[in-house]
């Protein structure tokens, strides 16, 4: 058994995403454009594009929007030339935070990210200052009540590296990030549909925040996630709701 209330955390995350669907779509369109520009418009030969298109489907984005984003990326149209920049920093108590961005203006983005860190009690670090505390992996989360034995057998056969049952009964499956699409397809073919399936930066160790510290940490994370140029925010902080 391992982990905190992963199920509660993911339900909260999904609810927040639903509330910001327009913003989620904007981020996905940027990611689809960049993936298509870098690797071509065929999802079968471009794993990054396929992942972005799958996320768009999960977010109920219309297929026409997806196609237009792919076409813009492949065609190199205005707006497709975003630069990928990763920022690293610390929240209160030294919590590790990674901020991945896609931007057409590096100066604007770094200023906005730095301002969010400083306004809410954190500070930016140098490249590599916290990334070593995370693993780049494919992650799947299955609802409590899923058959652990059957899922473990299917996951390991699919090429997963690890299967963990959390304290709340949810089950987490981890794989190499390069194998994400293959493992996802195999699990779904075996009848297992994950509530969460993503390529992520998973913290090697987590730090709980409660009370006032939890409120402060959540404000910092929200401020970063609400920046237009930010695509993903990863942290080893766990905000515990009381």
Curated annotation (Swiss-Prot):
Keywords recorded for this protein, A-Z: Cytoplasm, DNA-binding, Transcription, Transcription regulation
GO MF term set: DNA binding
SUPFAM superfamilies assigned to the protein according to its UniProt record, in alphabetical order: YebC-like (SSF75625)
Gene Ontology CC entries for this record: cytosol
Family annotation (Pfam families): TACO1_YebC_N, Transcrip_reg
Subcellular location: Cytoplasm
Biological-process GO terms, alphabetical: regulation of DNA-templated transcription
Membership in a protein family: Belongs to the TACO1 family.
HAMAP family for the chain: Transcrip_reg_TACO1 (MF_00693)
NCBIfam families linked to this entry: PRK00110.1 (NF001030), PRK12378.1 (NF009044), YebC/PmpR family DNA-binding transcriptional regulator (TIGR01033)
Name this polypeptide is given: Probable transcriptional regulatory protein BMA1884
Taxonomic source organism: Burkholderia mallei (strain ATCC 23344)
Source organism phylogeny: Bacteria, Pseudomonadati, Pseudomonadota, Betaproteobacteria, Burkholderiales
